[in-house]
């Protein structure tokens, strides 16, 4: 026990009996109501030694003042006297009556109700077994209490007493029971200022406790609890009226039933019989102080650390400030740190450093009591500079970073289970510290980027970085021991301040290779990360994380970007040797823009020298997927296509020597195996690409093979007759020739518009187009030297051979495509001996086509004439419109005079400057 409060006189031997007290905190004034209806005001003296009487209002009321309540913001003093609730003007020396509630009488008690959702003043009044709700507002031009509908259940058996409000909760007693009522504004109603529907509230009543004594309800706002007197025990609930799971955790037992209690953190002060006052701690309920004041019977809370006590004609103040320093020192010595901290926090007598020192001692005491969570929660309230953090971590010297372990500290020898709990609490504490420091560092970085940083900011940032380095390194070790699943998340943090060497050493010593890889990745140690993957991929006992090493390396390389191209090429060589397809994915990923933005020429040169087999799939992706237009890549792909086809063709000819004889020519792409596949791809590329040199490719292809390829290239050169001769005479494939014509026909091109006529000529006069334009020399072809076992007669196209005309097919072509062929020219090409019956079908088709074309032209002419006539009509109408422009004519856009400027006229007759009209039209388009 110790003397928490020192009693001092406020007023002694008053001529009236004191019935109630109220404290006005704004001017430190105590208001005392008397049985004779007088009101006394005592204000703290100028020298702050005692109180002095500053006002007496003998006309305050005619009868005893039973209850007082100060409403500072509204400048009201609420009072119950003679069963009526009245509102007096607080700032008036005579305390003039502002209003009174006539409707409710007699008033048993009342309480101020201040919902969080509203700034208005409400009062809840108890009278005749009911509760009433009134709102302070304006009515008929003056302020008064307006009744608000309050709907609640059940009906009370007696009049409620001892009402207290906390937020939207109302606590009260009826007979020997305590109740709570949850207040909720009726959403179907409005306040009078918002509409015609009157405001209303609903109350939901719940029974809490029963008791057999004088009721007492005390809100403990800072602890978010409410205390209820229940005989000699004071029990508490939360602010919603719910009891804690541990019923005994917040119960305070007085030596006898208190008649009245007040809460003055960290104490509960109870008024007992015979003027005895008992003070108990709210932390453990222990008795702190007992004092006796003659005939004391009324308590009232004052400023923090003050309680007023009234007897019949005497008033005292119980003050904690006089013995505060001595009491705090005593509590620290007795290890009652919670009380010491609360007293220091409530007072301005202690500097901030002193408060932090008390908290530090309290936290260490909790740690020694193995209350680790509470200990580190308190450490979290302490200013966390590097020295403070180190002093905490010294309790775990094995966690200190290198360079700090020489600092000595007392190591608690505790069981493994307790040490694990301590490490868990330490981890939570360090996590909060690192989050706070990272935010401050980010703030300093923003100051630097904006140019607003000062020299002191730079020093402060350096301290924060050092603290964060210690915290992160310790937290890494702590997580490894307690929460291994969080190690990787900690390493991935962008603000992680662990030095690379410290983190690497820690992870290697623990064998956490997966986490080590993440460290390499986040710190951009790319070579170390890739070397780790390659090394682990060959180990049978490696972590499952490294099982799919090739794919992991591919994804890693894909994320590096063009700035790391030499590194990508270095490790791509290893991937290509292991898996060609995976190696190509390094350079062709569509997941990010990294691969797309690589230097493509450098990649091509690398693949040429290191892995030519990967070049074709890479270039196909670049050209077809990424639509690369550069001729360099197109010609390189063609070069490798031709080289691959040449190699495959050599093997194919040796295996199937008769496949390319004059009697049995295998069509391009129909060959078995890779040759057919690559020839199809080559043909498609020759057809769709426009970024290569046809002459260069033509020289790479032998004249005795690759006929389809040569035909497509000749078409690109507009040498259609030679190309069609290949399809018709060599390949005997008229449908392919017809498809060729469809591909190249263009009615607006002088040469390409004649392609169908050229096909007709080739069919009618096949011997006029010989393949003599490109001489053939066996030793100059890409594969001429390796065909010694194949007869030249079976592969060469004989330049002197004769082809038979195919008039019937030509006539069919003419009939099918009569609209694309010069009919007269085609008919003139037919041999004179051609029977008329053969030509009839073609002539009939020509006539029908000509008729359709004539009808189409006639219809087009009619439509054009109709449109022209309408245009002329509109033109004539516009020209006949009279436009009057005078000196008063204004522009509808800028509202200036038209004068002699160029102008436009709108359909409704309005005028505008031409440039204003153009500007407005341009703005609308934008």
Curated annotation (Swiss-Prot):
Disruption phenotype: In 1-cell to 20-cell stage embryos, there is defective autophagosome degradation with an accumulation of endosomes, lgg-1- and lgg-2-positive autophagosomes, amphisomes and paternal mitochondria close to the nuclei. Reduced number of gut granules in the adult intestine. RNAi-mediated knockdown results in a reduced number of gut granules in embryonic intestinal cells. RNAi-mediated knockdown results in the formation of large late endosomes/lysosomes, but with simultaneous expression of rab-5- and rab-7-positive vesicles on the basal side of gut cells. InterPro entries: CNH_dom, Vam6/VPS39/TRAP1, VPS39/TGF_beta_rcpt-assoc_1, VPS39/TGFA1_Znf, WD40/YVTN_repeat-like_dom_sf, WD40_repeat_dom_sf. Residues 15-306 form the CNH domain. Disulfide bonds: none annotated. Pfam families: CNH, Vps39_1, zf-Vps39_C. Transmembrane segments: none annotated. It is a peripheral membrane protein. CHCR repeats lie at residues 590-768. Keywords: Autophagy, Cytoplasm, Endosome, Lysosome, Membrane. GO terms for cellular component: cytoplasm; HOPS complex; late endosome membrane; lysosomal membrane; membrane. Its main location: cytoplasm. It is found in: Cytoplasm; Lysosome membrane; Late endosome membrane; Late endosome. Gene3D superfamilies: YVTN repeat-like/Quinoprotein amine dehydrogenase (2.130.10.10). Plays a role in vesicle-mediated protein trafficking to lysosomal compartments including the endocytic membrane transport and autophagic pathways. Believed to act in part as a component of the putative HOPS endosomal tethering complex which is proposed to be involved in the rab-5-to-rab-7 endosome conversion probably implicating sand-1, and via binding SNAREs and SNARE complexes to mediate tethering and docking events during SNARE-mediated membrane fusion. Belongs to the VAM6/VPS39 family. PANTHER family: CNH DOMAIN CONTAINING, VAM6_VPS39-LIKE PROTEIN. Probable core component of the homotypic fusion and vacuole protein sorting (HOPS) complex consisting of the core class C Vps proteins vps-11, vps-16, vps-18, and which further associates with vps-33.1, vps-39 and vps-41. May interact with lgg-2. Interacts with cuti-1. This is Vacuolar protein sorting-associated protein 39 homolog.
